[in-house]
Amino acid sequence: MAPSQAPSRDRAGQEDEDRWEARGDRKARKPLVEKKRRARINESLQELRLLLAGTEVQAKLENAEVLELTVRRVQGALRGRAREREQLQAEASERFAAGYIQCMHEVHTFVSTCQAIDATVSAELLNHLLESMPLREGSSFQDLLGDSLAGLPGGSGRSSWPPGGSPESPLSSPPGPGDDLCSDLEEIPEAELNRVPAEGPDLVSTSLGSLTAARRAQSVWRPW
């Protein structure tokens, strides 16, 4: 029995010795690792000082102050990017809406002048286009159209509404022979016009006259 137990004791002793050596190596390496870590931190702080030099950093600043300035600069940059992204999205939405309105105006002109199209079909088509109008949350057709006109060269925004009333109010007099062809939609029977929302063809025909002229000077995104 004694010979068989001797190798097991030797193995156990060797394992204990290896563990102590590994623990000793870790203790010996710990100061070196800590020194390298601090060197990396100081090097990064010095790079931050150089990046911030000439703006807010004075001759000498504590490390905490350098970090605070860096955080403020990064936050400002992120806020600026967010504002730019929101502005680009708003401009893209306005261009899309302006193109949609322009297309709806052209459809309105066509169905108003084409004698082969039934008045009921024309009213249903325009009603569908108005219901499908891309609107921002909380906005209305008047707001969208006013923003589109205001963004155009020479556009007058809400000043393009018919005088003497709100955009929903009907025209004060029937269109004459020399008026815009888009106003021919008013010849549709009143029973059919009632199917169109209050923000209906009257608003399209009266408010988009200036949009048609201004669109020649500015390209519009077309939804087709």
Swiss-Prot record:
One of its GO terms (molecular function) is DNA-binding transcription factor activity. Residues 96-129 form the Orange domain. Does not bind DNA itself but suppresses both HES1-mediated N box-dependent transcriptional repression and binding of HES1 to E box sequences. Also suppresses HES1-mediated inhibition of the heterodimer formed by ASCL1/MASH1 and TCF3/E47, allowing ASCL1 and TCF3 to up-regulate transcription in its presence. Promotes cell differentiation. It comes from Mus musculus (Mouse). This is Transcription cofactor HES-6. Transcription repression requires formation of a complex with a corepressor protein of the Groucho/TLE family. Interacts with HES1. The keyword Transcription regulation applies. Its main location: nucleus.
